[in-house]
Amino acid sequence: PEAQRQPLHPTYLARAYWHVLTSPAFLLACAGLAFNFGGFFIYVMSAPIFLMRHLGVPETGFFWLFGPAMMGLMSGSWLSGRFAGKITARQTIKRGYLIMGAATLCNVALNLALPPALPWSVLPIFVYTFGMSVAMPSLTLLSLDPFPQQRGLAASCQMFLQSGFNGLLAGVIAPLVWGSTLTLA
């Protein structure tokens, strides 16, 4: 409706962006989303080295990473949908973080105890993406809820911050940690 339209005046837009990008709750939720996704994205950026060098997988074997990861994303998303309306968003996020934390601890323990090998080196990635996908929808809503009249603008800011963090991961952090499966973990 015309009454709910936002003006495109530069001063109004600058204030609106400032309001969103200086909100501590928004920035905290965006950081959570970025770091959660970053725990998986680091493997995406390191996939050729992780799979081919560390695990000895051929060029045609990238399913070993992306198959379990996608299954984790889909099943976690399904569970998050089942949680909706039954438990609070914060409870859903807490469960997602518990799963991601367990996956991370398991990943580090496996890399300390065993040499890199399939399927053990990718199993924690399935569990991590499962937990990430459980938490992500509720965390996204928490980041957008403070701005009911400007959800699109807030979503745009959220994706801008996420993309910037992904760029940092891809260009700086991934090359620093892909030297071993333990540093990736």
Can you describe what each PLM-predicted range is?
Residues S75-Q91:
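Helix-to-loop junctions at the C-terminal end of transmembrane segments
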Residues E59-G67, S156:
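Small-residue hotspots at the loop-to-helix junctions and early N-terminal turns
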Residues Q91-L139:
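C-terminal transmembrane helical hairpin of 12-TM major facilitator-type secondary transporters
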Residues F130-S133, L139-L182:
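A late C-terminal transmembrane helix in Major Facilitator Superfamily
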Residues T22-I42, F126-F130:
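Pair of pore-lining "gating" transmembrane helices in MFS-fold secondary transporters
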Residues M45-G61:
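Short amphipathic helix-loop junctions that connect adjacent transmembrane helices
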